[in-house]
Amino acid sequence: MAKFEIKDGVAIIPDGTTEIGELAFWNCTSLESVTIPESVTEIGYGAFDSCTSLKSITIPNSVTYIRDHAFRGCTSLESITIPESVTKVGEKAFQDCKSLKSVIIPESVTNMGKSVFWGCTSLQSVNIPELVTEIGDNVFASCRSLNSVVIPERVTKIGNDAFCDCRSLTSVTIPESVKTIGEGAFGSCSSLKSITFPGSVGTIRYRTFARCTSLENVIISKGVKKIGYEAFEGCTSLKSISVPVSVKEIDDDAFVNCTSLESIVLPKVKKIGHSAFWGCTSLESIRMLESTTEISAKAFSGCVSLKNITIPNSVSEIGGSAFEGCTSLESIAIPNSVTELVLGAFEGCTSLKSIAIPNSVTHIGGDAFRGCTSLESIAIPNSVTYIGNGAFRGCTSLESITIPESVKRIGKSAFEGCTSLESITIPKLVTEIGENTFIGCASLTSITLPESLVWISKSTFFYDINGTYLVLTAIYVPVVKADFYKQRLPEELHDKIVELAPEKKTKK
């Protein structure tokens, strides 16, 4: 490798030199300017890497290849012109050239390596040559002053994080030639206001537009099939989005914390992923058509403005905490395709006054309606066999509830803290009532217990939240089961036990 002299901050490169070799001027912090002779055809790997005082360089028309890391970390370099002879610019060739404001890339360049301009925080504009077919990973990542870019019609791929953290980029047009857009490609482009996503790209990938905090409008063209994981996470200005019939799946966290999103229509979406719309605090309505089959856990959790939602008959699964904390939701109809209301499905829906549970439901899961403080009454269908732990815990307005004869088990704390509940009848098939089931039901005065019960805790009914006995007037029990209950209930409540004679069988 040839050795070169630096004199008064200027590199002396002799005529006849054909290559500036690997790391030739690496970390030459006193180097300020370079004139490369016409004989040079290649600038080698890391040739000027970390030349932090380099302000100007002239690259002759003889150079065809600028290799990887060639000018990486030249933090004082303000502009550069790449000659028409160059066809390839290597990976990280100009990475972290933080003072670079402009660069002219000739049409001869067909290949730009990964991370070429990554961290060029002063770069304001750039032209991408028409013959370039791929914009590689991180090519313009963290070019925070880049305000405009034109993607040529020949480009078929935009790599991972290609424009990530381009905070000044206000608009970008993605041509239909593009078939793949990588993960995080436009993530944290905080000035980007609108985007049209072409149908030629089948999937909006992981964090493609995440944290684009100025993004207001998104048009997704027909042809896109999936909106990926965290695709629009944290797009706090997003008000509207057009979802075409081609989209079949919205992945987990796709729109999490899109706090300005007001409404959305999902015409052919089959699956709504985990936490897909979690924290969309302005979302008032969502419309799903008959194609949706699954609403995953926490899908709409924390959507505090959600007032209207129609769950289509095609839905067979509503995941845990799917509507948790939807404090404006007043009513909801569950379709007869659903067989189970799982853990926390409607927990904390403090405005929910009515809910229609269909005959298809067999299980009401734990905490399903916990904290629904406006719920006054509920009809549980005869199909339900199990009421889970804490299912109606803290439903302070619940005055009456009819537990159907189909129920066999009532879980722990199922009705704990239902302070308006006055009476309850436990159906004939129930064999077990969990601990604290009716604890804190301060208005409860009468209870009817069945013959079928084989286990009951002393804490099941009889204490308020302070640990003192409820003011019960009557505990109705079958006469044949009276001894059983006296053995299991506190002695202080024995005088409240009213023995019921067996029902007379009707003659046929």
Predicted segments with their positions:
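Consensus positions within tandem repeat domains that build extended binding/scaffold surfaces
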Residues: 21-26, 44-49, 67-72, 90-95, ...
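Structural signature of tandem-repeat unit edges
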Residues: 2-19, 29-42, 52-65, 75-88, ...
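A structural signal for leucine-rich repeat
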Residues: 459-464, 487-492
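Short acidic DE-rich linear segments
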Residues: 506-508
